[in-house]
């Protein structure tokens, strides 16, 4: 058994959100990564795809998620399953937080580029 306590070194700030890494291979998990996402009202992440399925559970506020051309509002207490390799964008119409889980080997791709990018908070 392993207990993980978030620290400042596990936090990644972007212009759109704050990601706090929890379970990940760098912190003792072998298969899964989990993290929290905190977004201020009006912020949106970039359109991108992820190579692995992700499970988002909104813990406060509301998120609007567009995936594969369909938009859903996800409120606190609801869970959204995002399929792999489908374009998505996450928007916070109000301040929101979510807990995310994914296989640890997932990578991100942005439309119009061939390169993939690792998620540092999930490694």
Task: Identify the residue ranges that each predicted region occupies.
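Ligand-binding loop in jelly-roll beta-barrel domains
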Residues: 28, 73-76, 84-109
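Conserved short histidine dyad/triad with adjacent acidic residue
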Residues: 33-50
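A short beta-strand-loop-beta hairpin characteristic of the jelly-roll/cupin
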Residues: 49-76
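A short, N-terminal "cap"/entry segment at the start of jelly-roll beta-barrel domains
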Residues: 1-31, 111-123
């Amino acid at each position: 058994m392993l207990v993980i306590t978030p620290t400042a070194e596990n936090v990644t700030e972007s212009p759109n959100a704050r990601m706090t890494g929890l379970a990940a291979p760098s912190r003792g998990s072998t298969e899964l990564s989990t993290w929290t996402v905190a977004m201020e009202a009006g912020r949106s992440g970039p359109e991108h795809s992820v190579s692995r399925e992700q499970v988002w559970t909104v813990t406060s506020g509301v998120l609007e998620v567009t995936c594969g051309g369909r938009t859903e509002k996800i409120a606190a207490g609801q869970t959204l399953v995002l399929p792999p390799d489908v374009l998505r964008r996450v928007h916070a119409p109000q301040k929101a937080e979510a807990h995310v889980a994914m296989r640890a080997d997932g990578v991100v791709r942005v439309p119009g580029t061939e390169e993939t990018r690792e998620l540092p908070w999930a490694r």
